[in-house]
Amino acid sequence: MAVTVETLEKLERKITLSLPLNSIQSEVENRLKQVARTVKMDGFRPGKVPMSVVAQRYGYSVQYEVLNDKVGEAFAQAVNEAKLRVAGQPRISEKEGAPEGEAQFEAIFEVMPEVKIGDLTSAEVEKLTAEVDDAAIDKTVDILRKQRRTFAQRAQADVAVDGDRVTVDFEGKIDGETFSGGKAEDFQFLVGEGQMLKEFEDAVRGMKAGESKTFPLAFPADYHGKDVAGKTADFLVTVKKIEAANLPEVDEAFAKALGVAEGTVEGLRADIKKNLEREVKFRVQGRNKQAVMDALVSKAELELPKASVQAEVARLLEGARAELQQRGIKDAEKAEIPEDVFLPQAERRVRLGLVVAELVRANELHATPDQIKAHVEELAASYEKPEDVARWYFGDRQRLAEVEAVVIENNVTEFVLGKAKVSDKAVSFDELMGQA
């Protein structure tokens, strides 16, 4: 088939598809005969329905089905012969004035763009490094102790201090009216750990069991409760009980309780360091990967297929609606969400996907079976039964595809870091974890 491709603009192309009418009619007749063999109609025995009746009942739908198939096959053959890589679905319409004995259709579509990676040797990338020090291990030990703390009631004369667990009754009013969520009895929280708004904690800190206090509380403008956000409430709080925290000693019993095989404090700290180093490795890889992807996007030159961007916007919009549903938002599927909100993110995702795909193709950065196996084993290593976790990954193609994608991104990251102008930057454990 001779294929003529017309360029409309940038990535948009048009192809005219010609189909012999006798070929279409022959296929319609064949399919109607197949329908006639199995169709059941009142007044006729199976397989004995006259073709005229079958054609009257099913002719339109069969013809529509045949046209769809024939046009789809012709389009696939045409773009294959023209060596075109199509982006998105074509818009196909019937063309008027076709030669006798033919049906003609116009297919308008976009092609995948030429991707120019750019000069990676001029790209500047900041590469992070981080170490697990004793302070990070100490902080993790403190967290583990807090997770296993017990509480004992304080003496009547004692006041509430940071770290104490308090039991309170409270009631808040705005303009003299109690609001939703503003009243509770026997409510417990830990003082000084950010579980309540700062003004609430400040009011309770220093109170004794049995005491009551009134105080104003200004809700932040971005408070999650929209009915009270930006407003000031008058609260009455009564402290009913104050309990002091008792932290377990860091000893052999503590280590054994945490599943340390040899049951020593040294073994516990070694296990913690190993786990933290694994987490640091993944965090550093993630941050460095992001820096590399930013550099790739900034250096690359390409046109974005509108169809691909629109498809990505639709995916992001669907994800946003699903998140709203998970939050319990009523009629989330009908919520009016402007699509242009997602446009910058969609364009970046499409751009990055095309650039990475071209870099992988041009430099053979595909994931090898050994790399995939090694990454699965690394992911599984942090679990109690790594063999079971590894089998879980290898037992599902979708999960393995996700691992493969990560490995490819790692290959791309290492490749770019080997070409770019890299400056090393050491960060602390807390900075890396966002705790500084």
From Swiss-Prot:
Protein keywords: Cell cycle, Cell division, Chaperone, Cytoplasm, Isomerase, Rotamase
The record ties this protein, via InterPro entries, to: PPIase_dom_sf, PPIase_FKBP_dom, Trig_fac, Trigger_fac_C, Trigger_fac_C_sf, Trigger_fac_ribosome-bd_bac, Trigger_fac_ribosome-bd_sf, Trigger_fact/SurA_dom_sf
Record-linked SUPFAM superfamilies: FKBP-like (SSF54534), Triger factor/SurA peptide-binding domain-like (SSF109998), Trigger factor ribosome-binding domain (SSF102735)
Task: Give the GO cellular component terms, alphabetically.
Answer: cytoplasm
EC number(s) for this protein? 5.2.1.8
Catalysed transformations (reactions): [protein]-peptidylproline (omega=180) = [protein]-peptidylproline (omega=0)
Q: Which domain of life is it from?
A: Bacteria
Q: What Gene Ontology biological process does one annotation of this record name? A: cell division
Please list the GO terms describing molecular function.
Answer: peptidyl-prolyl cis-trans isomerase activity; protein folding chaperone; ribosome binding
Predominant cellular place of this UniProt entry's protein:
cytoplasm
Enzyme class name: isomerase
Q: Where in or outside the cell is it found?
A: Cytoplasm
Specify the PPIase FKBP-type domain's residue ranges. Answer: 163-248
Q: PROSITE patterns under this entry?
A: FKBP_PPIASE (PS50059)
Query: What information about domains appears in the record's comments?
Result: Consists of 3 domains; the N-terminus binds the ribosome, the middle domain has PPIase activity, while the C-terminus has intrinsic chaperone activity on its own.
Q: Which family does it belong to?
A: Belongs to the FKBP-type PPIase family. Tig subfamily.
* NCBIfam families to which the protein is assigned, alphabetical: tig (TIGR00115)
User: What does the function comment of this entry state?
Assistant: Involved in protein export. Acts as a chaperone by maintaining the newly synthesized protein in an open conformation. Functions as a peptidyl-prolyl cis-trans isomerase.
**Protein name as it appears in the record:** Trigger factor
The gene coding this protein: tig
